[in-house]
Swiss-Prot record:
The keyword Phosphoprotein does not apply. GO terms for molecular function: allantoicase activity. SUPFAM superfamilies: Galactose-binding domain-like. PANTHER family: ALLANTOICASE (PTHR12045), INACTIVE ALLANTOICASE-RELATED (PTHR12045:SF3). The lineage of its organism: Bacteria, Pseudomonadati, Pseudomonadota, Gammaproteobacteria, Pseudomonadales. It comes from Pseudomonas fluorescens (strain ATCC BAA-477 / NRRL B-23932 / Pf-5). HAMAP family: Allantoicase. This is Probable allantoicase. It comes from the Bacteria. Pathway: Nitrogen metabolism; (S)-allantoin degradation; (S)-ureidoglycolate from allantoate (aminidohydrolase route): step 1/1. Belongs to the allantoicase family.
Length: 331
C-alpha cells in the first residue's frame, strides 16, 4: 500500500488541524477526542497514562458498542478540495481498532451538513488492521468540503490524513487583488526537495507563522559541496510582487542566504520538473538571511512575468519556517 501513498502524500493534507479542520458531530468519542484525528504530528503512546474514561489514546476512540449500528464523525475540512488519497492510521490501536471503515463526502458552499445533505461515497468499506497505516487512492475529482468518516462497528483510529488539491474559485479574485499564490490554502504544494530530515517541505506553505522549529522545513547538516533546495507549484499562475522568507524559531540553524528561481511550466512530471528547475530564471537574487526573522523582498524581485513554479535555494543548508509568494493571478 505504501507504494501508492508516495505519490499522493505530496499533496496538501486537507484534514490538517493547522488548516482549521474540525469535528462537526460525532456519534461517540468517549475514550478519545475525535479532533485528535487531525493533529499534524504522528500519534504517540503514553505508557501508564489514564484519564477518567480509561487509557489515554492519541486518536479518536469510541465505546464498545452493545447495540446495532456503527460510529461516525462528520468533519469540516480546513480547506475544500478534490481528494487524491487517504491514510487511515491505527497506530497504537491493537485490541481496540475498528475492523473496517468507509468515507463519504459532500460539498457545501456555506453551512454544515444536515439530514437533507446528499453524501457521495468516496471510499467503500475497507478492512483495517491494528497499529497500521492504510493508504487508499480516491478516484473522484469533485471538490468536497465535508467528510463523514464511518467506523464499523466501533473502536479507535489515531489519524486521518486526506491528501488532495485545495479548491479556490479563482474567477472571484479581482484583477488587482494580491494573494499568496504559494499558500497551501490556495492550492500551493511542495513537489520535491534535496532533503527534509528535520522538517517537512510542505510546512513552508502552512497558514500563519510557525508554531515551533518542527513546524518548518529543515534539512540535515550538509557535509558535501552544494546547497539545499525545494520546488513549489503555485496554486495558480501569477506575477510575483512580494516575497516573504520567514526563519522564525531557526536561530543556530538558519541558512546563511537564499535565492529563488521561477518558471512558467506548461507540462511534465514532478521528476522532470525537478531536473528542469536547474535552468529556471532568477526571480530573487541571493539575499542574506538572519535568524528568527521575517524577511520581506519587493524591490529585489526580478520581473519574469507570470510563473507557475518556484525553486527556493538555501545556502548551504538549514531551516525556513514559511515562504510567502504574493502576487496577482494571471487569468
Amino acid at each position: 500500500m505504501k507504494t501508492n501513498a508516495v505519490a499522493f502524500e505530496k499533496f496538501v493534507n486537507l484534514a490538517d488541524a493547522r488548516l482549521g479542520t474540525k469535528i462537526i458531530s460525532v456519534t461517540d468519542d468517549w475514550f478519545a477526542d475525535a479532533n485528535r484525528l487531525f493533529q499534524p504530528t504522528p500519534a504517540v503512546w503514553k505508557e501508564g497514562i489514564f484519564d477518567d474514561n480509561g487509557k489515554w489514546m492519541d486518536g479518536w476512540e469510541s465505546r464498545r458498542k452493545r447495540f446495532e449500528g456503527y460510529d461516525s464523525a462528520v468533519i469540516r475540512l480546513g480547506v475544500a478540495g478534490s481528494i487524491k488519497g487517504v491514510d487511515i492510521d491505527t497506530s497504537f490501536f491493537t485490541g481496540n481498532f475498528p475492523p473496517s471503515a468507509s468515507l463519504e463526502a459532500c460539498f457545501l458552499a456555506a453551512g454544515e451538513p444536515d439530514e437533507n445533505t446528499q453524501w457521495t461515497e468516496v471510499l467503500p468499506a475497507v478492512e483495517l488492521q491494528g497499529n497500521s497505516h492504510h493508504y487508499h487512492e480516491i478516484h473522484n475529482h469533485q471538490p468536497f468540503s465535508h467528510l463523514r468518516f464511518n467506523i464499523y462497528p466501533d473502536g479507535g483510529v489515531a489519524r486521518l490524513r486526506v491528501y488532495g488539491i485545495p479548491y479556490r474559485d479563482w474567477s472571484a479574485i479581482g484583477d488587482d487583488e494580491q494573494v499568496d499564490l504559494a499558500a497551501a490554502l490556495n492550492g500551493g504544494r511542495a513537489l520535491a526537495c534535496s532533503d527534509e530530515h528535520f522538517g517537512r517541505m510542505g510546512n513552508l506553505l502552512n497558514p500563519g507563522r510557525g508554531i515551533n522549529m518542527g513546524d518548518g522545513w529543515e534539512t540535515a547538516r550538509r557535509r558535501t559541496p552544494g546547497n539545499d533546495w525545494v520546488i513549489i507549484a503555485l496554486g495558480h499562475a501569477g506575477e510575483i510582487e512580494k516575497i516573504i522568507v520567514d526563519t522564525l524559531h531557526f536561530k543556530g540553524n538558519y541558512p546563511d542566504s537564499c535565492s529563488i528561481q521561477g518558471a512558467f511550466v506548461k507540462g511534465g512530471t514532478d521528476s522532470q520538473i525537478e531536473t528542469q528547475s536547474l535552468f529556471w530564471r532568477e526571480l530573487l537574487p541571493s539575499q542574506k538571511l538572519e535568524m528568527h526573522a521575517e524577511h520581506s523582498f519587493v524591490e529585489q524581485i526580478r520581473a519574469l512575468g507570470p510563473i507557475t513554479h518556484v525553486r527556493l535555494n538555501v545556502f548551504p543548508d538549514g531551516g525556513v519556517s514559511r515562504l510567502r509568494l504574493l502576487g496577482k493571478v494571471k487569468k
